A protein has these predicted regions:
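Short glycine-/polar-rich loops that comprise or flank the Walker A/P-loop
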Residues: 122-126, 156-158, 402-404
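FAD-dinucleotide binding site
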Residues: 50-60, 90-91, 99, 116, ...
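A structural signal for short, well-ordered beta-strand segments and their strand-loop junctions
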Residues: 128-131, 211-216, 354, 388, ...
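Extended helical coiled-coil dimerization/tether regions that scaffold
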Residues: 2-28, 164-334, 341-348
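Acidic, Mg2+-coordinating catalytic modules of nucleic-acid enzymes
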Residues: 2-17, 40-45, 136-139, 145-158, ...
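Switch/communication elements of ASCE P-loop NTPase nucleotide-binding domains
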Residues: 1-76, 309-444
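A short hydrophobic beta-strand->loop->alpha-helix junction that borders the nucleotide-binding pocket
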Residues: 131-134, 163
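Conserved P-loop NTP-binding catalytic core
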Residues: 44, 64-129
Length: 504
């Protein structure tokens, strides 16, 4: 198993070729991006790369394209004509690995410069896509789509999608809640060491190490289930001439008639748990012990058939015992809690985690702490690489120089940049230095203009210090309104510099 993973480089168009798009003659943007330098030794400390760039430059496509490569390899496939990736380079433990695609979309592998079979390539332990935007570009996990595992069906899926879209592609907050819950129930039967790690994530978020899901039958569904359990035929369960409330179940049985016996067995157990009421609860516990995980998987058959609904998904605060229903949480709380708990349920040492636009719905205070919270929450998982695509200067300012870097998709950059220049800096500075967005009332620009004016007033317009400040200001002029006072001041400083040079 991989103990340490570091993504180094990625090249390609990072767009999928479906049948329609392949018939349309349109330019495809090619990116060659450096994510990080190869560590000198096996890096057991996790790493963060913050990916920045303007809308439309390909941040989301970049992350999704890389995830697609590893998802394809994780399925044991050797080619995929939907991939726009031409090359990936990464470090797995102490080995340098490369993946390339040829002209007919076959994948080729190298380890330490030598050709190898794709099955010999060490891959990240897990590849996880976490997002709270309904417009993400990530591929939905095959398990969510209901596809069977082609090879090694007994092994857990390498790629996991933790986003808003359900298996039909529809965006729904309920989908992301259920996905986190499903992962937690699966993990609740893991070995003790893994359950302890997940319990620590709950604790760091301020919650007790368990989650409780409350299910509810509506009255018609409950009566239908009682009759199904009693052995009635489906056509006799509904009164003649009424709209069938069993249409979902009927469609499922058209595909697999044997499901009816499973529905009867599961419904009997669920009704027994409800004990004459319309409600029952299941619990995933990472400190104590619960056997509810297996029934949780079974009861999803009733949920998909429309015979059962999830009423609440509850976590309990440590400080006061207050219960938070995730279905009623704010969008910011939902993003943090379900995102981090969902991630906790699948992350392992040596994972590659993509996070797209984490700032969505987050209060500025949470944005300023996001990366720190991420690393502390998952500090007991080593050798992971987190790649975040963001437009937020507040998130960027939270990076730690010792284990982070910045990746800009600006055409003139696209190299891994030292985090030292961005860590802890003001939002106004980062809007200029990182995002090249001066705005109309940027305090940092005003301070730089004041410095330049003082130098000019002191007869130092010909100095290197003045020239450096002026150069950093002039490059911002194309992004400013022509008649803005700030732009006029910068042009006047240019004229002062030219006059000073003429005198010399």
């Amino acid at each position: 198993m991989t103990r340490s993973f570091r993504l180094l480089e990625a090249s390609g168009t990072f767009e999928r070729r479906d049948i329609l798009s392949s018939q349309i003659d349109r330019p495809r943007s090619f990116l060659n991006v450096e994510f990080a330098q190869k560590p000198d030794v096996t890096a057991l400390q996790s790493w963060v790369s913050v990916v920045i760039g303007k809308n439309g430059v390909g941040k989301s496509r970049l992350l999704a394209g890389i995830a697609d490569i590893f998802e394809t390899l994780g399925r044991g496939r050797k080619r995929d004509d939907e991939l726009g990736v031409s090359r990936l380079a990464y470090a797995s433990d102490d080995r340098l690995c490369e993946i390339e695609t040829d002209s007919i979309f076959r994948l080729r592998g190298k380890v330490d410069g030598r050709r190898c079979e794709l099955t010999e390539l060490p891959l990240p332990t897990k590849v996880i896509a976490l997002t709270t935007t309904p417009f993400d570009k990530f591929r939905i996990s095959r398990s969510l789509l209901g596809f069977p595992r082609q090879q090694h069906p007994d092994l857990p899926e390498r790629y996991t999608y933790l986003g808003l879209r359900d298996r039909f592609g529809r965006a729904s907050p309920t989908a992301v809640i259920f996905r986190a819950i499903e992962g937690l129930f699966n993990a609740s039967r893991a070995e003790a060491s893994r359950r302890l790690r997940i319990a620590e994530v709950f604790g760091f978020l301020g919650y007790k190490p368990h989650i409780q899901v409350r299910y509810e039958f509506n009255t018609p569904s409950m009566e239908r289930l009682k009759r199904i359990v009693a052995g009635d035929l489906l056509k006799r369960v509904e009164a003649p001439g009424t709209n069938s409330g069993l249409w979902r179940l009927e469609k499922m049985l058209e595909q697999d008639p044997s499901l009816l016996s499973q529905v009867r067995s599961i419904a009997e157990d669920a009704l027994h748990r409800a004990n004459g009421t319309r409600f029952f609860s299941l619990r995933a516990d990472f400190e104590g012990y619960s056997e509810d995980d297996r029934f949780f998987q079974k009861v999803q058959l009733l949920r998909r058939a429309g015979l059962l609904g999830m009423r609440a998904a509850e976590v309990e605060r440590v400080i006061d015992g207050a219960v938070l229903d995730l279905k009623l949480a704010s969008s910011g709380e939902l993003g943090i809690v379900t995102g981090f708990l969902g991630l906790a349920s699948v992350i392992e040492d040596g994972s590659l985690i993509f996070i797209d636009e984490p700032e969505i719905s987050l209060h500025p205070e949470w944005q300023t702490r996001y990366i720190d919270l991420l690393l502390k929450t998952f500090g007991n998982f080593g050798g992971c690489h987190f790649a975040l695509a963001t437009h937020s200067p507040l998130i960027l300012s939270d990076i730690a120089p010792e284990n982070s870097n910045v990746v800009s998709l600006d055409p003139n950059r696209r190299e891994a940049e030292d985090a030292e220049a961005f860590a802890g800096r003001s939002a106004d500075y980062l809007l200029v230095a990182a995002f090249q967005v001066p705005g109309k009332n940027n305090l940092y620009i005003k301070q730089e203009i004041i410095k330049a004016l003082r130098l000019a007033a002191n007869g130092k317009a010909a100095t290197n210090e003045f020239a450096n400040i002026l150069e950093s200001l002039v490059v911002l002029l194309p992004q400013m309104e022509e008649d803005s006072p700030v732009a006029e001041l910068i042009r006047e400083l240019q004229e002062a510099a030219e006059a000073s040079m003429a005198i010399q």
